[in-house]
Amino acid sequence: MAVFVFILTFFFMEGVAWFTHKYVMHGLLWNLHEDHHTHTNPGFFERNDAFFLIFAVPGILCTVLGSSLGFLALFAIGLGITAYGFCYFLVHDVFIHQRFKWLRKTDNVYFRAIRRAHKKHHKHLSKEDGECFGMLLVPYKYLKAEIEASRK
């Protein structure tokens, strides 16, 4: 049962990330997210990095409370949130934005589609008119474009 809860939580987090990105990061908390689009911060860290902590808190709380209370489902939820956060970090910060110079030379169609969709998202420098707010699920048109490009 705990494995099912973990997997369900992991995939549910894609919806949470999409919703939060579209309505919170590009809404009420745009002041934290804006420098991620405009690259106005000259240093390594961005105000946008605060979202790492904001998203980490529920994962940590669920993991610690689930573990200390012996509530396995809550522990699994915490691990699912944390696993999604780790994947988000690898895909978004490492693979897409190359904040760390790992995973640079992949030729995988799916990963290229993720990169293409995110690039489209970053074409919008304001909080309005955005698109592609998710991370791991990309609109089919980007996957299709990469499949067609790989056949050439």
Regions found by a protein language model. Give the residues of each.
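N-terminal signal-anchor transmembrane alpha helix
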Residues: 1-20
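Cytosolic/stromal cytosol-facing helical appendages immediately following the last transmembrane segment
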Residues: 2, 12, 27-51, 65-74, ...
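Hydrophobic, membrane-inserted alpha-helices
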Residues: 56-63
